[in-house]
Amino acid sequence: MTINHLILQNLKKNLKNYYLYVFALMFSVALYFAFVTLQYDPAMDDVQEGIKGAAAMKTASVLLVVIVTTFLLYANNIFIKRRSKEIGLFQMIGMTKGKVFRILSAENLILYFGSLAGGVFIGFAISKVVTMILFKLTGLDRIATLSFSVPALVQTVIVFTLIYGLILLANYLFVKQQTILSLFHVTSSSEDRVKKVSLFDIIIGSLGIVSILVGYFVSSKLFGGTFTSMETLFIAMIFILGSVIIGTYFFYKGSVTFLFNLIRKKKNGHLAVRDVLSLSSIMFRMKSNALILTIITTISGLAIGLLSLSYISYYSAEKTAEHYVPSDFTLTDMEDAAYFKEALDAHGIAYDETVIDVLIAEVYVKDILEEPLDGVNFDSDIMILPVIRDTAVESVNVAPEEAAFTGYNDMMQQFMSLKDSGSIELRGKQKVIPQNYIGLHSEYLVSTYFSSGGLPLAIVNETTFSQLQDDINPEIQLDSSVHIGIDIKDARQLQEAVVLFHETPFTSETPQYAQVEMSQSQKQTFGLAMFIVGFLGLTFLITSGCILYFKQMDESEEEKGSYTILRKLGFTQGDLLKGIRVKQVFNFGIPLLLGLSHSYFAVKSGWFFFGNELWTPMIMVMLLYTALYSIFAILSVLYYKKVIKDAL
């Protein structure tokens, strides 16, 4: 047999056994090429407009490379260890280490760059679909075209050639460092099998569960008023991160073994074949794979969490725009409003107008704060708030000595939570007007120009408002003191009104807002974030799922002898598959459930920073991630089925 024939035979064998690796490699290349193609697409100029958009795309492409590189190196490590006996045989028949390395390199070259070419072709084919998805998410009215980008091809080839160089280096070091004898023991020694549960396992296992639960508990208190200074907040975040990650490692290192051993003891040693194939195998293997499982679980939680938060922001974009701009159009200058209304009247567009006088006042709120805010560089006892008269609000009516708040942002409430009632003071230039605070309402009545994006609006009686008008502090007043809201009666005429809004020659330097454009701006920002996070999350899901699948391939080959014995003892293929299915539920389910749990507590602790709806976006992301992740568990069961079938 010639060397070339040997290479082709090995290549054929590897392609047959490692088809999922080839698929994952092609998929990774396709994603990267499609992603880089977007950066060179002229139609993407609006999305990448500004430093932040372009930087986000470039950062995402770097993270994509890091994920793919880590996966390929880890997968290559699994495969070369699996071929250790084959490498040992090559050396036993007289091949030098250099020759063995050249054979491996030639095989990898054909397999790798063949997959690279296939991946580029797939990436080119899906690039239009990817662009369409991005345009849809960001709300851009653009036509996606199918075009081949030479710069994207060059960048992809350079990046994956460098990754190939790292793979060659890893293979070279492996072949050089191993002796012939050690090559025949690599597989058997790669996983440390535990023969019995020790006291150390019980302690580690208990610590793991407690550490995770403590991290969850602290995260639930993160923005609840327990940590009132920036220093303690930062320390708490670091503690949560460390506690959960270390707890996850200890969980795999000891908790799984400990818990499953309790189940086994409860059965008093009467284990069915299903239990032998599932519980025992998982007990002995998860401990040795604790590090990689911890990494997969942690990054899965991170990916699910980030995708949930970005989807929460995207999902809440319209509601957020309504909070910032409570009418279809808001203006802050009467003359500009007159120009705009004149244009609407000229085109027969009916509208409703709301005019609200707004003053800015210092409000002493110390007595109604739930907790004092420490560690900040401003006086938290005093808020600079917009103030309006109650006659401007149909649903609120206050007495001369009373005041109410409305439109307080959820995020601000987490940091500066208010009591239901108490005493406040409205401070003018010289006078102090004491008021009884009677509660917080949910309506948003003036634009973000007055509310600074999250501060509440104070509603007072006409008498109190007049007193403030006579004693205003000019140093804190804005350039405008009037809010004009215009709502189009017929929604079908809204787009025409937006065009007129842009054509109106506004003369004031104070801002004017269109709600629909604020919503589009929010969707464009968060749509890009969701697209990038989704892209990275999908890449990690595919690569981590493949790693778990490859581990199951190795385990199935190692346990093939056991299946042969069990088949000879009379157990059917169906009997064995019952245990295998349970095993895969645990092998894939435990990292998935832990990742989902980590992401749930992370998202729940700070979701209000990103939007005003938690459950629907988060559940949708989790269900989608679970469905895609389950595919690899199903593939593992099918592979085991093939191994069991071949066992006799």
UniProtKB/Swiss-Prot annotation:
Q: Which GO terms describe its cellular component?
A: plasma membrane
Q: Which InterPro entries match?
A: ABC-4_Integral_Memb_Prot, ABC3_permease_C, ABC_permease_BceB-typ
Q: How does it sit in the membrane?
A: Multi-pass membrane protein
**The keyword Lipid biosynthesis belongs to this UniProt entry's keyword annotation:** no
**UniProt keyword terms in alphabetical order:** Antibiotic resistance, Cell membrane, Membrane, Transmembrane, Transmembrane helix, Transport
Note the superkingdom of the native organism. Bacteria
Q: Which GO terms describe its biological process?
A: response to antibiotic; transmembrane transport
The regions listed as transmembrane in this protein's record are 18-38, 60-80, 110-130, 150-170, 199-219, 232-252, 290-310, 528-548, 590-610, 618-638
A Pfam cross-reference name: FtsX
Q: Where in the cell is it found?
A: Cell membrane
Give the family this protein belongs to, as stated in its UniProt record: Belongs to the ABC-4 integral membrane protein family.
- What is its quaternary makeup? The complex is composed of two ATP-binding proteins (BceA) and two transmembrane proteins (BceB).
The UniProt function text for this chain reads: Part of the ABC transporter complex BceAB (TC 3.A.1.123.5) involved in bacitracin export.
**The protein's name in its UniProt record:** Bacitracin export permease protein BceB
Lineage of source species:
Bacteria, Bacillati, Bacillota, Bacilli, Bacillales
| Gene it is expressed from | bceB
